[in-house]
Amino acid sequence: MSWKRISMSAFLVLVTKAVVGAIFFGLVFTDVHEGAGTAFRAEGTENHGIAMVGYVAWSLAFSFVFARGFENRGWLEGVRFGLIVWLLYFVPMTLGIYGYFVVGPEWMLSALISGLAEALACGSVAALVFRNAPMKTAAAG
């Protein structure tokens, strides 16, 4: 496990998450997101700094867990890891938001779809960073 690779992966995963999120909620699902009404903070009142801390932590954790058990297995392993993350993170979070906030089923469906795209893209990026990772060698003793 190389901290240099983990750092590189975390940065690229963070950028990938931001790009995919911007594409889906900034371009594809704009009407759905705007229709959420009072469920979310109004434009200009968001706490971007707090959100960024969460995104950085998520990207670091994503990359660290990937490095601990999924490196050197090819891009399909990244897709599988992304699917696992989607099931463990995006699905429960989205259903929880739908259950407790004033959002419609269209928002829930769009969040599940964009979350799947984010998780699969981030898993693929991590797999590219961790391909052919240096093999661990036993310490000379």
Can you say where each PLM-predicted feature lies in the sequence?
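Juxtamembrane/disordered regions of integral membrane proteins
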Residues: 1-141
